[in-house]
Amino acid sequence: SLMNMMYNKATGTVMILDNSTTGMTGHQDHAATGKTLLGEPTYAIDIPALCRAIGVKNVVEVNAFDIEKLEKVVKEEVAKDEVSVIITKSPCVLLDKSKKPVYIAHEDKCKKCGMCMKPGCPAMTRNVDGTIHIDDTMCTGCGLCETLCKFEAIELVEAGDR
């Protein structure tokens, strides 16, 4: 579809969500990872270079969890009157075995505004009184909830294994 956009002189912004796996087929490596399905080293497709090779001038890579920068980039790119590509990069949270941060919600600081619930994180639920609870067994440690909370009701407490 990106090639057709370029060929037909369309406008618009395409987002490529690159977490170094093919999620729809069960966490398999894809052509940009540099590994075959058997885990053997192979040539890695350079996604930004591929986009540029078909004529896309505006190709931006951004960390998927850097919300402020991502929001800024999206606003800039959708305002352009030509095709642009935003590539969000972040490892698949289900395959990343590194130590994860542990977040807790301070119910006494929670203003019940719901901003932290906007991403739809399955680890976040509301208590009966409307305050937030974080299930640490489901939390992937991405920190989006802490970033979105303007009342410091969500806190990083330690790093631990998940």
Name each model feature, range by range.
Residues 1-87, 98:
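Thiamine diphosphate
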Residues 76-127:
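Glycine/aspartate-rich loop-and-adjacent alpha/beta segment that forms the canonical ThDP
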Residues 103, 111-133, 140, 144-161:
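Iron-sulfur cluster-binding cysteine motifs and their immediate structural context
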